[in-house]
Structure formats: C-alpha cells, structure tokens
C-alpha cells in the first residue's frame, strides 16, 4: 500500500464529485500529497487547494476550507487542519499505520515492489569508459550509479538492458596502440623511450608481454596494426570487465563504436531525407577554443530545431566523421533494436552533449523515443591529505580495483550514492572504515543486524502479534517512515535518482537506533519485556517489518543485509 497514492486518489475522486455537484468548476491535477517535513503538521499535507484556487480564481484559504470539510469523512483521516497560505494537513487514524505494518510483514521484501514500468524496455548505458586502461574511481561512481539505477527500474517493472558503449575508434585508441607497441618491443628486450603524449602506465606491460609471447618478433607497427589493436582492446576490455565485476557490475550488452562505423552514413541519410542535414557555416565559438578557428562550409545537423544551442558539425575538416556522427549511428542502432526509452550516464564534463543527444534521438525517432542523460560529478579522494591524481597518461591514478580491495565492494557501492549524482563526492577512507554513525553503510547494516539480534533474543514462545499495542511516539514515527518505502521507490525511479534510496535507509536506521536508545533510560521502552509478552510480540512485529524494508532497500544496491556484525 502506498498511503500517499491512496489519499491522492481519494482527493481526485472527491474533486470530481465536487465538480459534478457544482461546488467547484474545475478539477486540479499535479497537486502534491506528501509527508510534511515538520511532524507537527500532521501525517500528510497537500497543496491541492492552492492549485485549485488558481483555476477557481478564489482565495486558497477559502478553497482549503471547503476541501477540508469534504476530506474529514475519509475513513483513513482522523483530523484535518488548514495552514497558510492554503495547505491542508491531515492526521491519519492510528489503525492505518497498524494496517500498513501488517502489509509489510505479509509482503516482506516485496513491499515497495511496484509495476509502473509495465515491462517496457529501457536501455541504461553507463560507464562506457574509453578502453585505454583500468577503471578509475570516477568511472566507479558512474558504474555504481548506472547499475543501481537499473536495479531500481527493474523493481518498478521495467525490462532493463544494461549497456556499455566501447569507444574503440579515434585518436585515443591510435595513441594506445602506439603505447602498447612500445611495451611489446620492451618485452622483446629492446630499450624504449615513452615520448610525451603516450600512455606510460604499468598496466600496459602485461599486454606487451602477451603480444611478445604470442607473436614473437614478427609484429610490425604499420603492417600488423590491426592485430595489435584487436589484442590490446580485447585485453583492456577484459581488465575493465574484471574491475566492474569487483564492483558487482555486469552489463548485458557491449556495443563497439568501431563496429558501428558502417551505420554512420545510413543514419545521416535518414536525417538528410528529413531535411535535417545541410551545408552551412557555424558562428565563431566563444572562449579559448576559438583561437585557431577558421570559418568554413560544413555538413551540419539542424539540432537547433530540437532545442539545441547550435547546429552540430557532422564532418571534420579532413572529411572524416565527427565523434557526434558516431553518436548518431549509435543511437540509431539503439532505436533500431527497439529501445524507445534510453538513459545515458555520463561524466559531468560531458554536459554539452545533453541537448545534442536529445535532439538526434528526437529527430531519428520522430519524437517516438526519448533519452534522459544523467551526469555524475567527480569523486575527490584524499590519501594522507593529498589528492590522488587520476590521469591515465601520467600512469598515476587511483583505480576502482584499488578502492574495492581497500574497503570492500558493498561499502564502495553504498558510499557512491550518498550524494546526488551531479554533486561532488568526497570519499574519505578513514570514515568508511569506522564503525560509527559517520559511516553510512555501517549505520544501516547495524540497524538490520540489531533487528535480527532482537528477534534471536526474544522469547521463543510469543503470542500472536497485535500491532494496535504500538502506540508510543517513537514506535508510530518508525512505522510512518517504513510506510513511505513504496513512495520513495516510485519517486526515485521516476526521477532516476537512486541516491534517494540511500537517504531513506539512513532515515530508517536513525529512527530505529533512536527508538532502541529509549530503552536505556526507560525499561518499559525496551523491545523485549519478559513480563509483557503481548507488547514484546508487537514490538518484534515492528522489528521484523523494519528488517524487511532495510533488506528490500539494500537489495537494490545488490548488498547482502547483515544479520550479525563482525
């Protein structure tokens, strides 16, 4: 049961009834029904009176007064209040919360599982790091974000495909091949000098050694470029897959930019046939990049027709296709595979791609497909108060493997979602190892383990639980938080914001730890009361529900909930 959806539905039905009775002239849509931030304002508030007042051209307080009288008879409602400038606050009957508690324990970890996706196909593309080396910690943030988002969408009924786009074409790959060829010669015993601009990373040595072992001295840089290329990319992609596996991330599909190059002309022709490709001139760009700029006639895509800032070039000065042209081919391929709902995770430095990607998807699909681009910001990592550099070409960068091996997979996955994806994240090694409230995953896992400890230590023979015995403020507060779980799941899924799950689990854990703490000073507040087995049974019923909700939340992270702390 999503109590907020239920009340929202009751309000909508009542508005239709009032319209039929001639009390109001219009119905309201897109009004809010949420728990208030201040507990003194009731269990649920709505702004429906203010939304309706705009259409009715009346004072919101006057409308709120009319609606409050109509909402009071709802079976679920105990009390209705009006607050300036027109909010309606509702206190629900205690039986509502006890009923939700029963439902949680009936559904167990399935409480919060929804079907808003109706098995629609959705493609979630994430990581898609250039295959030039192991994943660094910034890639790890994108990997966790994409993977958990995919899990969240599955939980609400979408048919999700997790995809990795291999950027295996372009100048960076050429540089990589030259770097590996030097390591190959080094493996054969030659002295090498790594010139500026090449990749000096130690991770390339085993690849060079592998080439030497397989081909001996027969490889030549020019003649055997394709052999070196395929071996190198295969080796690095395997390395990336191993790193992602350590993070608990596995993609369903890997798509190669290099293999899609034949689709560029096909996709550009489709746009051209729609009158969306033309030869023209771009205005001089602003900023440093304009210093060497010269005006020239270019092949352009009319992306401004779809809300972009400028039209986009499809060919470079040398006649080769731009990276954007490759993007067009890739998204044409996605649409051809039946994906009309696409999500792409990119680093925040790719913010300029958002409008052009939306433009091309709209153009290729005649507005039938949609794409949502989610940007993740950087991760600041500090070691001995010194920032760790993360440049592949310098050879000195913190890898995802380094972090997972240092703190563990579950900690890494959870911490990566303790901030909204577009906010900078500080990863503090010391804090994530602490067994304290400052360590978010420990705090949540400790709540789950504490719940199971209580259930293990409770008397084996307990009467049937009667939730109506749960009446204290702390007990009801925790039940009300647990009741929010379906709403949290739905909002997080609709907004593509999995960090909301993290925030919610921390809220649940805090409410439980606080409630447990009351028993230190008040023996009657302890969960286990040897002289009151009926109340003990009711409190164990609450503890059981809490454990189900935490386990349900952690399952979205693919994190095993702990029943005991080490």
Curated annotation (Swiss-Prot):
A motif ('HIGH' region) lies at residues 129-139. Keywords: Aminoacyl-tRNA synthetase, ATP-binding, Cytoplasm, Ligase, Nucleotide-binding, Protein biosynthesis. It catalyses: tRNA(Arg) + L-arginine + ATP = L-arginyl-tRNA(Arg) + AMP + diphosphate. SMART domains: Arg_tRNA_synt_N, DALR_1. CDD domains: ArgRS_core (cd00671). GO terms for molecular function: arginine-tRNA ligase activity; ATP binding. Its EC number is 6.1.1.19. InterPro entries: aa-tRNA-synth_I_CS, Arg-tRNA-ligase, Arg-tRNA-synth_N, Arg-tRNA-synth_N_sf, ArgRS_core, DALR_anticod-bd, Rossmann-like_a/b/a_fold, tRNAsynth_Ia_anticodon-bd. It is an enzyme of class 6 (ligase). GO terms for cellular component: cytoplasm. Belongs to the class-I aminoacyl-tRNA synthetase family. Monomer. This is Arginine--tRNA ligase. It comes from Wolbachia pipientis subsp. Culex pipiens (strain wPip). The gene is argS.
